[in-house]
Curated annotation (Swiss-Prot):
Binds 1 zinc ion per monomer. Binds two Mg(2+) per subunit. The keyword Magnesium applies. Mg(2+) 1 binds at E268, D319. This is DNA primase. InterPro entries: DNA_primase_core_N_sf, DNA_primase_DnaB-bd, DNA_primase_DnaG, DNA_primase_DnaG_DnaB-bd_dom, DNA_primase_Znf_CHC2, DnaG_bac, DNAG_N, DnaG_primase.
Amino acid sequence: MSGRISDRDIAAIREGARIEDVVGDYVQLRRAGADSLKGLCPFHNEKSPSFHVRPNHGHFHCFGCGEGGDVYAFIQKIEHVSFVEAVELLADRIGHTISYTGAATSVQRDRGSRSRLLAANAAAAAFYAQALQSDEAAPARQYLTERSFDAAAARKFGCGFAPSGWDSLTKHLQRKGFEFEELEAAGLSRQGRHGPMDRFHRRLLWPIRTSAGEVVGFGARRLFDDDAMEAKYVNTPETLLYKKSSVMFGIDLAKRDIAKGHQAVVVEGYTDVMAMHLAGVTTAVASCGTAFGGEHLAMLRRLMMDDSFFRGELIYVFDGDEAGRAAALKAFDGEQKLAGQSFVAVAPDGMDPCDLRLKCGDAALRDLVARRTPLFEFAIRAAIAEMDLDSAEGRVAALRRCVPMVGQIKDPTLRDEYARQLAGWVGWADVAQVIGRVRGEAKRTKHPRLGRLGSTTIARAAQRPTAGPPTELAVRPDPRDPTLWPQREALKSALQYPALAGPVFDALTVEGFTHPEYAAVRAAIDTAGGTSAGLSGAQWLDMVRQQTTSTVTSALISELGVEAIQVDDDKLPRYIAGVLARLQEVWLGRQIAEVKSKLQRMSPIEQGDEYHALFGDLVAMEAYRRSLLEQASGDDLTA
């Protein structure tokens, strides 16, 4: 009969395992007020954080999917374990010894459980690490030495060696109290024709750990030509602990720097991870025995606190060969599923990061990451490179190939920018034609969705005739232009309802009005004393008109002063507040784009202090932008 864990132990472990620390191993949390932390929910996909942790209460709750509970409930859900196993896992974490009642032995009670499998893997890792010092392991040590990995590096990454004996590990662990069924369940042993045998033999091994540092499996490299298993690399099979689609080598070492720097570097192999970390790129990770996929992305997004308002950097580092280029193009297909900014860094001359470090030193790896190329640009240029641009037919073929790629880009501003660049890369003189084709492709795939604020008003504005004499159409803004709609509505609000527009409008800079005539109207309002001048109606309009000598600007002031705001009177205050918030958000978005552009041109390693200071500014700007977006998207704001 299974032993029972005392209520006293359960309470003590719950108290000792602080929920914010436990959750923090899986989710990047940010302060969200008194006794409140928030992050992206690990239990469902979301773009805006709705997962909250209350440290003083010891509970978590997601307002998106409804999951919630104490620290035990969190571990049960995220690790797919029973309550007892969650208690044991947290006990191991804090070093608490559990007293079982009514149990024969801990081995009998724990047989086959997650905690036993973890213990078996930990013991195996220690066994393999010790075996690396044996005479038999000389080729494994030589392999590491030839790649400039010393004994300290081997210890840091837990490198080990699987001896040649068919059951060396199995017998060692059985002497420690583990049974064959447990070792088989952990993927360490298997049943051979003549009895139990080890899974790995005569190979260099790396332990694969969770973000919490638990060993869940191993990766093994072939060293000897007479190895019966021809595959260069083999991994632990799928087990209760080891799921190749959701484990990453190096995540335990990289997670804190990924969370701190909001940047993850994805490489292709174990030695590449080692090389990157030893060179100072401590955010490097690699998938294990499978392609980098959706679950890996989700894990990194949570660590980077990546959402639709702040976007972390995901940098793919590939070998400089055709396989690496193909991998980069494959990554392009998944980029749109990720809110984070994706980049590509390709090592020169077909070298992987390990080879590059060996030949050119640590600085070469840091420079490789610093010179990253946006994934969009890399994918488009790679496609163009396959075409003969010296012929008209080749240029047409390049456009046909690349226009759909650019059309996938969701951000319309970024999409237009890449359309312009595409024209230049291909050598197409008519830039407007390329932009038009890309926009058409984007509409065919998925029409960009307008925000709730303004969609109805824009449709109505499109039905209104343009006022004013024909001679002024060349300089006056088009009232049907949706990109200028927030500017127009903000000016109408300030001219017709100055008291409602108030200080928020007065705080808007002239630079926020991108059309010259709208900027001129904004300047005239400011010169007239702003909305706080205490005037309204015709008197206020006359005062504003007196501040300009331009007949075009004066006529536009009159037009904006009488053009109807398509909203009910009782909704005017919220509507105007939303319009002003939208305009602020658009202006702030441009400032954020400039900061991001500067960050992309900087190296977080070589320019650490300046990079992180600017990064802090970006986070603050994104937070303010988010509050503006929330204010501008209320249901009551649409006309």
